[in-house]
């Protein structure tokens, strides 16, 4: 290599190192914010999944002819429980889509279950069922809030990662945009 090429290479490397320092700490902080928001989403979905067995058992006692709906809810819960939900999901569009679809299936199955319970006045009068229903409604609200925070946090992170000079820093340290929820 001649002196000019060596000089350009040195300048390029120096510029990359100087610019790559730009935003490094902020990238790390925003990445941690995304991870924290994702953990909250997971916690709320897990809380909902934990309510399902109790809800199914209470409904079984009253709605003996609704086996199909009860089976759908149980299968949806099993599907959700069988999914991988670590940080890799945030960087893998296919896994993220499967996770989102499984949660949507759970939401749909629970909605059908609650609709079926309208036909059973004795069940609706059951104190344990009412308590579980209130807990489920509260959990659905928490899920909505957690998802909203996650969407906002990912949007902030993804915007930052794509801006210059942070885009260079992100590329150097292997940080990529994160997956986000689509509309249900």
Q: What do these predicted regions represent?
A:
Residues 2-184:
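A helix-centric hydrophobic-segment signal that preferentially recognizes long
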